[in-house]
Amino acid sequence: MEKSVIIYVISDAIGETAQHIIRAVTAQFSLNKPADIRRHAFIRDEKALLETLEEAKAADGIVVQTLVQSPLAEYATDFCAQNNIPNIDLLHTLTAAVEAKTGLKSKQDPGNMRRLDSNYFDRIAAIEFAVKYDDCKDPRGLIDADIVLVGVSRTSKTPLSSFLANQNWKVANVPLVPEIPIPDELFQIPNERIIGLTTTPEKLAQIRKVRLKSIGLDESSSYSSEKRILEELEYGYDTFKKLGCQVIHVEDKAIEETAALITEIITSYH
């Protein structure tokens, strides 16, 4: 019988760095049950740390730590070694290497990544921009966008806009519908800022049927019919050609993967 995988994330900040890495690793295994990731954030003293480590020991878990402060990191490492708890320190090997290379000492400030600096406020502004100009609510926003995503319905325009906004990109998106004229503003911006999104008819039909079902509508609606989908995709390709923009196939790609392709294309022009 397969043993459950319980992973304790122990961090003196949010702990999301460790979570991303753990998900990347566990995705490589065909587990019967998803790994049980238990995140303990903002651990800033030995008492809270010991309580979490004792819990990990009782659960026969794996400890993944991102403790910036050396005393806490060393305490966790020693405890795990003494109690035969698998322990991965994601920060200190790299921290030591950077210190050795630069001659500088780490600030050991767990909140340093989350300072309310200009980068933070730029990200908030980008998120607000993505919300304001989602689904081409106001075509004037296309002029000021860093990236404009164009595609038929259900090609991940909105989630990609949100994801890229969290990386400080100002993103607007335009739905392509054969019956609705393309906004003039789309032809007034450099085509290297425009990314066309498309997919296969089969994948689009599948996604649209799921969407219709989720909102209680008939899955056999024209919205998910083969004829309508082929018409829309053809219209999409014609539009991409007119715009002279790069095109990405989004089928079977995670949002993160598509976003990485988009940023690679956009930055290649600068």
Swiss-Prot record:
Pfam name, any one: Kinase-PPPase
UniProt key word Membrane: no
EC number(s) per entry: 2.7.11.32, 2.7.4.27
Catalytic activity: N(tele)-phospho-L-histidyl/L-threonyl-[pyruvate, phosphate dikinase] + ADP = N(tele)-phospho-L-histidyl/O-phospho-L-threonyl-[pyruvate, phosphate dikinase] + AMP + H(+); N(tele)-phospho-L-histidyl/O-phospho-L-threonyl-[pyruvate, phosphate dikinase] + phosphate + H(+) = N(tele)-phospho-L-histidyl/L-threonyl-[pyruvate, phosphate dikinase] + diphosphate
InterPro entries linked: Kinase-pyrophosphorylase, PPDK_reg
Gene Ontology terms, MF aspect: ADP binding; ATP binding; phosphotransferase activity, phosphate group as acceptor; protein serine/threonine kinase activity
Binding residues annotated for ADP, in chain numbering: 151-158
Signal peptide positions (record): none
Keywords of the record: Kinase, Nucleotide-binding, Serine/threonine-protein kinase, Transferase
Superkingdom to which the source organism belongs: Bacteria
Keyword Transport included in the entry's annotation: no
Function: Bifunctional serine/threonine kinase and phosphorylase involved in the regulation of the pyruvate, phosphate dikinase (PPDK) by catalyzing its phosphorylation/dephosphorylation.
Family recorded in the similarity comment: Belongs to the pyruvate, phosphate/water dikinase regulatory protein family. PDRP subfamily.
Name of protein: Putative pyruvate, phosphate dikinase regulatory protein 2
Organism listed in the record: Listeria welshimeri serovar 6b (strain ATCC 35897 / DSM 20650 / CCUG 15529 / CIP 8149 / NCTC 11857 / SLCC 5334 / V8)
